[in-house]
Amino acid sequence: MKKLLPILIGLSLSGFSSLSQAENLMQVYQQARLSNPELRKSAADRDAAFEKINEARSPLLPQLGLGADYTYSNGYRDANGINSNATSASLQLTQSIFDMSKWRALTLQEKAAGIQDVTYQTDQQTLILNTATAYFNVLNAIDVLSYTQAQKEAIYRQLDQTTQRFNVGLVAITDVQNARAQYDTVLANEVTARNNLDNAVEQLRQITGNYYPELAALNVENFKTDKPQPVNALLKEAEKRNLSLLQARLSQDLAREQIRQAQDGHLPTLDLTASTGISDTSYSGSKTRGAAGTQYDDSNMGQNKVGLSFSLPIYQGGMVNSQVKQAQYNFVGASEQLESAHRSVVQTVRSSFNNINASISSINAYKQAVVSAQSSLDAMEAGYSVGTRTIVDVLDATTTLYNAKQELANARYNYLINQLNIKSALGTLNEQDLLALNNALSKPVSTNPENVAPQTPEQNAIADGYAPDSPAPVVQQTSARTTTSNGHNPFRN
C-alpha cells in the first residue's frame, strides 16, 4: 500500500494538470464524440436497424421445432378402472420455398438500415458543426468582453480627464455628464457581455458534458481567408454527396419497394414441411384386462411425414388493393420530399457561398475600419486637447473603434463557421476539416469572465462619486492630474 500511494497521488496530480491545460478544438470535439448523448443514440439506432436485417432474413431460413407431450388419464364412471399414460415427441421442419413477401421484407429492412446509416452520418456532421460553432461562440464572447473591458477603461480615462478639466474650469459640466453617460452605457454592455460568455460556455458544456477553464484562442496574426469554388461546381458536388439529399433518395426507393410489397399480396406461397414423431401409450387399472384377454393394448408408434403447403389468396375484401394505393400515395409523398430536399440543398449551398464571400469582404472592411477608427480617435483626442473638438466627438470615436474591433472578431468567426456550413451542405464535412481549423489556433485564453475582464468595483465607485444632479462644484485653480493611482475620488470637488 505504501508503494501504491505515491503512484495514486501522481495519477491524481496528472489528472488535475490535464484539466488545467487549455483544450483545443480537436480535443473538445473528441470529448463530444465520446459523450454526446444524441450521437450515441443515433449510433444505437443504426446498430439496431442493421441487426434487424437478420430478423428479416430469418423467415427465409429453415424453421426447426421440437415438441413433447405427456398426458395422464384417470377414468371414472363407465371408464372407472381404466387409466392411461401417453407420451409423445415430434420434430418439425418448415422451409419456405416461395413467399415473395418475406423476400420483400428483407429488402425493405436493408433499405431502412441504409437510411439509418445516412442519418448517423448526418448526426456526425451535425455534431462537428455544433461543436465548432459553440467553440467559436465562446471565443467570440471572450473577445467581445475583452473589447468591452478595454472600452470601459478608455471611457473611464476620458471621464477622469474631463472631470479634472471641469474642476479647473476648462470645460462645461455637460462634457462630464456626456462622459458619465457613455461610461454607464459601457457598464451595461459589460453586463450583457459577461452573460453572453456564461451562456456560450454553458452551450459548449451541453454538447460535450464538460466545462473548460481555458480554450485555445484564434491566431489572429496568421489568419487567412480563401475564396470558395464557383457556386456551380459546389452545386454539382452537393448533388452527389449531400446527406440530406441522399437520405431523401433512399426514402423514395423505400417507398417504391413498399408498393411492390403491397402488390405481392396477390401472389401465392409454397412451403415445404417435414416432421417425425413417436408416441407411447400404456394402460393400467382393473378393467384394462378382461377374462377374454387384453382389452387395452399398450402402443409404441413412430411416424415420418413430408409435404408441401400451397396457398393462393383469391379475394380478401379489397385489402390488397387498398394497401397498394396507400403505398402509391406514400411514394408520391416521398418524391415530393425529395424535391423539397433538393431545393433546400441548393438554397443552403448558395447561401453558404454568399455568406463566405460576405465574411471575407467584412473582414477586409473591418480591418480598414479599425485603422480608420484609430486614426479618427487620435485626431479627436488631439482636437479636444486644443479645444477644436468636444468630448462627444472623442466618445463617439472611442465607441466606433471598439465596435469595429468587435465586428472584425465576429466576422472572423463567422467566416470559419460558414466554411464548415458549406462543407456540411456538400456532405464532405469530417474531422480533417476540424483539424485544419485547429491548426489556426494558438495561445490559451480563460473562459472565466472574471479572468477575461476583472471587476473594477473601486473604479465604478469612483465614477459613482459624481452625481449629475448635484450642484455645480466650486471652480478651484488646481493642477490637472490623474488621481486614480492613489484611489482618491477625482470627482470629489
Curated annotation (Swiss-Prot):
The chain crosses the membrane at residues 63-74, 83-96, 269-279, 301-311. Its main location: membrane. Residues 75-82, 280-300 are extracellular. Residues 270-298, 446-493 are annotated as: Disordered. Changing R389E: Partial channel opening. Increases sensitivity to vancomycin, by allowing its passive diffusion across the outer membrane. It is found in: Cell outer membrane. GO terms for biological process: bile acid and bile salt transport; enterobactin transport; monoatomic ion transmembrane transport; response to antibiotic; response to toxic substance; response to xenobiotic stimulus; xenobiotic detoxification by transmembrane export across the cell outer membrane; xenobiotic detoxification by transmembrane export across the plasma membrane. Residues 272-287, 446-459, 475-493 have a biased composition (Polar residues). It is a multi-pass membrane protein. Residues 1-22 form the signal peptide. Keywords: Antibiotic resistance, Cell outer membrane, Membrane, Repeat, Signal, Transmembrane, Transmembrane beta strand, Transport. In vitro, inhibited by hexaamminecobalt(3+). Outer membrane channel, which is required for the function of several efflux systems such as AcrAB-TolC, AcrEF-TolC, EmrAB-TolC and MacAB-TolC. These systems are involved in export of antibiotics and other toxic compounds from the cell. TolC is also involved in import of colicin E1 into the cells. This is Outer membrane protein TolC. It comes from Escherichia coli (strain K12). The gene is tolC.
